[in-house]
C-alpha cells in the first residue's frame, strides 16, 4: 500500500523524506541513504526465504539506480536524501518541501549517523547473495557480478564457480566450472523479468533450455573441469508511465533506468558548519580532511522528453578504477531529444519543482539531450514530462 501511494517513481523506492506524507509523492521527494541499503537487505532476505526472482529484480533496481548516487565516488561523504528528480544538492534547509528541518541534501561525512553507519553494508551484502545453494544440491546464480564462489554440489563435491561480467553495463556473463572430478548437479540462472530473448551457450553450443523472463533457467547435466556457460541477456529500451505523477515517463535499458545528464559543479564546504545539528564526530577529527560537497547544476535540467524520437547508445571504455557510477566514468551514454519547460524551476523551498502538468508550455526548440544510467547521476531528472511533438 505504501509503495502504491508513494512509490510511483523510478529507482525502486518511494517518497519518504524521513516520513511518507499524504500528497508528497512527486519524484522530487527522496529516500534516506540507509533506506536504500535496508531495502536491498530486505530484498535479499526475501529472495533467500522465497526464491522468488521478483526480489532480485527489485534489488537490482535499487542497487543500480538509487544507491550509488547517494554517495560520493570515494565513499567519504554521503547525503541523507536522494531523489529520482534532483536538480540541486546543497546545504540549505529545504523544509517544508522536505519534511524535517536541516541541511539534508549536501554530501557531508559527519551528518546523518544512521546513514554513515549503514551505507557501507550495501555492496558487501549484495556480493554475499550473488551465488546461492539450492535444496536439490545445486547452485543458483541469482545476481550477476564478477566473483569466485566455492560451492558444495551433488553428493558433496566441492567446485569453484568463476563468474566474469560487467553487468549491468554489458549483456554477457561468463561462468567457468572448476572441479577435481566430474559431478552432476543442477545449475540455475535467473532470467530477469525485463529480458525477452535470453540465450545460453555451454562450451560454445547454444542450448534449448527454457529461458522465460522472471524465472530461473535450469541446466542439469554432468559437469567437468573447465566447462563454460555463457549467459546473454539482451537489453532493450522500455518506457514506463507514472500516471499518478502527471503521466510522466522514465526510460529503462535492461535493469538500468536512464536520467538526464546534468553537468555537476562541486563546491567544497566546511563539514562542521554544514552538518545537521545533532551530528557527532570524534574529538580531534581533522574536519579539513573530510570536506562536505554541494553539487550544483551547470547545465539546464528542466527538460521534457520526446518519447517518439529514437534513443541511441554510445559505449565508452570501462573505467580503470572499476567504478562505473560517475558521469566521467559511466561506460554508456544515450542520445535522445527533448524540449525545455520554462516554468519548471527551482521552487520557493530551493528544490527541484514538482513535475509540471502535461499541458505546460514547452520550448519550440527541439534539443539533443544526453541520458546516462541513473545511478551515475548525482543530479538527475529520471521522471520526465512528455514533449508530444
Regions flagged by a language model, labelled:
Residues 57-65, 70-176, 212, 232-389:
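C-terminal beta-rich recognition modules with glycine/proline-rich loops and embedded aromatic residues
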Residues 24-27, 38-51, 68, 132, ...:
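Well-ordered alpha-helical scaffold segments within catalytic/enzyme domains
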Residues 185-188, 219-234:
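C-terminal beta-strand-rich structural cap/linker in extracellular carbohydrate-active enzymes
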Residues 195-220, 239-244:
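Solvent-exposed beta-strand/loop surfaces of large extracellular or lumenal domains
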Residues 182-202:
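Beta-strand-rich binding/interaction modules
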Residues 31-47, 118-126, 171:
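Well-ordered alpha-helical segments within folded domains of soluble proteins
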Residues 165, 177-181, 190-193, 221:
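Non-cytosolic beta-sheet module surface loops
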Residues 4-38, 111-115:
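Solvent-exposed loop and edge beta-strand segments that line ligand/cofactor-binding
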Amino acid at each position: 500500500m505504501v509503495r502504491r501511494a508513494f512509490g510511483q517513481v523510478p529507482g525502486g523506492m518511494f517518497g519518504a523524506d524521513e516520513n511518507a506524507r499524504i500528497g508528497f509523492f512527486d519524484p522530487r521527494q527522496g529516500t534516506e541513504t540507509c533506506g536504500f541499503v535496508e531495502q536491498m537487505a530486505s530484498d535479499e532476505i526475501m529472495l533467500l526465504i522465497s526464491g522468488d526472482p521478483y526480489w532480485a529484480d527489485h534489488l537490482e533496481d535499487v542497487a543500480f539506480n538509487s544507491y550509488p548516487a547517494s554517495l560520493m565516488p570515494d565513499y567519504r561523504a554521503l547525503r541523507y536524501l536522494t531523489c529520482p528528480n534532483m536538480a540541486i544538492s546543497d546545504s540549505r534547509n529545504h523544509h517544508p518541501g522536505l519534511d524535517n528541518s536541516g541541511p539534508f541534501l549536501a554530501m557531508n561525512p559527519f551528518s546523518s549517523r544512521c546513514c554513515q553507519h549503514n551505507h557501507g553494508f550495501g555492496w558487501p551484502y549484495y556480493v554475499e547473495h550473488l551465488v546461492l545453494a539450492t535444496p536439490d544440491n545445486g547452485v543458483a546464480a541469482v545476481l550477476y557480478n564478477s566473483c569466485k564462489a566455492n560451492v558444495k554440489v551433488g553428493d558433496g563435491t566441492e567446485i569453484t564457480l568463476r563468474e566474469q561480467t560487467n553487468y549491468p553495463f554489458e549483456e554477457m556473463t561468463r561462468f567457468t566450472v572448476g572441479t577435481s572430478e566430474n559431478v552432476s548437479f543442477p545449475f540455475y540462472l535467473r532470467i530477469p523479468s525485463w529480458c525477452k530473448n535470453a540465450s545460453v551457450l555451454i562450451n560454445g553450443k547454444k542450448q534449448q533450455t527454457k529461458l522465460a523472463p522472471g524465472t530461473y533457467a535450469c541446466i542439469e547435466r554432468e559437469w567437468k573441469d573447465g566447462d563454460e556457460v555463457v549467459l546473454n541477456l539482451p537489453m532493450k529500451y522500455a518506457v514506463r508511465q507514472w500516471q499518478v505523477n502527471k503521466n510522466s515517463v522514465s526510460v529503462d535499458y535492461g535493469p538500468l533506468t536512464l536520467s538526464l545528464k546534468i553537468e555537476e559543479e562541486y563546491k567544497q564546504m566546511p563539514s562542521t558548519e554544514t552538518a545537521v545539528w545533532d551530528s557527532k564526530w570524534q574529538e580531534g577529527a581533522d574536519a579539513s580532511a573530510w570536506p562536505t560537497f554541494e553539487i550544483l547544476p551547470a547545465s539546464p535540467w528542466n527538460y521534457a522528453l520526446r518519447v517518439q524520437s529514437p534513443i541511441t547508445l554510445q559505449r565508452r571504455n570501462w573505467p580503470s578504477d572499476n567504478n562505473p557510477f560517475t558521469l566521467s566514468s559511466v561506460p554508456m551514454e544515450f542520445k535522445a531529444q527533448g524540449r525545455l519547460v520554462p516554468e519548471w524551476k527551482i521552487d520557493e523551498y530551493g528544490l527541484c519543482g514538482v513535475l509540471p502538468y502535461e499541458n505546460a508550455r514547452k520550448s519550440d526548440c527541439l534539443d539533443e539531450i544526453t541520458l546516462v544510467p541513473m545511478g551515475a547521476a548525482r543530479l538527475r531528472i529520471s521522471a520526465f514530462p512528455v514533449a508530444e511533438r
